[in-house]
Regions:
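Alpha-helical transmembrane segments and their helix-helix packing motifs
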Residues: 1-137
Length: 137
């Protein structure tokens, strides 16, 4: 959702900060049931960087990327507790946590690039979990 908002929804860069831009950001929060949690954490007037921070790096938001990555690591630790050796998916999941940066660095490096990299690593992790735990079709 963030990637689409960032690249597709605004007709041009001149609309950044406009009422259209602000409505779109608020709609994103509502679409992930995050408006109330965001307002409790950041206040009433949403700013794009704060919304991105909330949806990517805020562990208090159950749909944030970092919250989900932490849950993946936790669940894989549970699955491997009786294993003699940690499977490759364990290290891959921990690498997802290492993608955590501050939001300014993410915006400086490129939000689109960050999200694409996260999605790519998440897809590779999913394939490895399938192999490690024999979730074949």
């Amino acid at each position: 959702i963030l990637d689409v908002k960032y690249y597709v929804l605004l007709p041009s860069a001149s609309y950044i900060g406009s009422s259209l831009d602000n409505v779109q950001w608020s709609t994103i929060l509502r679409s992930v049931s995050g408006e109330g949690g965001f307002q409790m954490s950041y206040g009433q007037r949403p700013k794009p960087r704060e919304i991105a921070q909330f949806l990517i790096l805020d562990n208090r938001m159950p749909r944030s990327l970092i919250f989900c990555a932490n849950k993946i690591v936790s669940n894989l630790q549970y699955l491997q507790k009786d294993a003699e050796q940690a499977p490759p998916s364990s290290a891959m999941a921990n690498r997802l946590l290492m993608l955590e940066k501050d939001i300014d660095q993410i915006f400086d490096d490129g939000l689109h690039e960050y999200i694409q990299n996260f999605l790519l690593q998440n897809a590779e992790l999913a394939r490895q979990v399938e192999v490690d735990y024999r979730f074949y079709r």
